[in-house]
Amino acid sequence: MMAKLMITVMMVLLLSLQQGADGRSERWRKNQMAASSIMRNLITARGDPPRFCRDELCSGDGDCSVWCTAGCNHDMGKCDTL
């Protein structure tokens, strides 16, 4: 009877350890996929446009992207931020 109890306890312990290891590897895999996606977007310039204002030539505020909060700087002829 004691041997059966010990075997049962050991099996439950081993299964719980395995489940914990699976959970950690799943989190690691998701983090790796997210990091790979970010790096791929940075390298190939795919996905969302960059969230900053580029020095674009402009003649009016309509020529500038939404990230250029100051609009067109008419003195320099380029888009600018505040």
From Swiss-Prot:
Domain of life of the native organism = Eukaryota
Expressed in which tissues: Expressed by the venom duct.
Q: Give the transmembrane ranges.
A: none
Q: Which UniProt keywords apply?
A: Disulfide bond, Gamma-carboxyglutamic acid, Hydroxylation, Secreted, Signal, Toxin
Q: Gene Ontology terms, cellular component aspect?
A: extracellular region
Which interval of the chain is the signal sequence? 1-23
Q: Where in the cell is it found?
A: Secreted
Q: Which residues form the propeptide?
A: 24-46
Question: Modified residue 4-carboxyglutamate is at which positions?
Answer: E56
Provide a Gene Ontology MF annotation, just one. toxin activity
Residues modified as 4-hydroxyproline: P49, P50
The keyword Iron appears for this protein: no
The primary site where this protein sits is secreted
The disulfides recorded in the entry are C53-C68, C58-C72, C64-C79
Record's domain comment? The cysteine framework is IX (C-C-C-C-C-C).
Q: Family, per the entry?
A: Belongs to the Pg turripeptide superfamily.
What is this protein identified as? Turripeptide Gsp9.2
Q: What is the originating organism of this protein?
A: Gemmula speciosa
Specify the taxonomic lineage: Eukaryota, Metazoa, Spiralia, Lophotrochozoa, Mollusca
